[in-house]
Amino acid sequence: MNANEVIANLALEHLGHDKGDYAVVHPNDHVNASQSTNDVYPSALRLALWEKSGQLQPQLTALRQSLEAKAEQFAGILKIGRTQLQDAVPMTLGQEFAAFASMLAADERRLAQAREELTEVNLGGTAIGTGINAPAGYAEQVCRRPVSYTHLRAHETPEH
């Protein structure tokens, strides 16, 4: 795996050793120890989605609050409501904006729930989800590491 070799060589340089001195830091034995693409890739995707979705949350809130403000501002403006591409019954423009705001409030709740579910990762499951070839306690320990740089409190999934 080329990425493991790059990481191993960067670690070697950082430690003051020559690139390729794999007796000190080996691409497979050290960098890739107890990992598999079947647990690392999905976990990395979950961590990335958790981080990026955190940027969406305040934007959704700001948009909802703007729509709520417009709902109040336009509470007295009458308009024709529409359904099935046809004119329907009268409503206020404020009611329409309030409906949009209500939908965004539901989206905010769903996003918060999805973000919570993204904290469950399958690191430590290794190739087939059993954790075979990983030392005891590895999954629990590796799930604690993202906290140091993302503030994410990841936890191991009960079923890999």
Map each language-model feature to its residues.
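A helix-coil-helix interface module used to build multimeric assemblies
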Residues: 1-125, 129-130, 134-149
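Conserved small/polar residues in nucleotide/adenosyl-binding loops
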Residues: 150-159
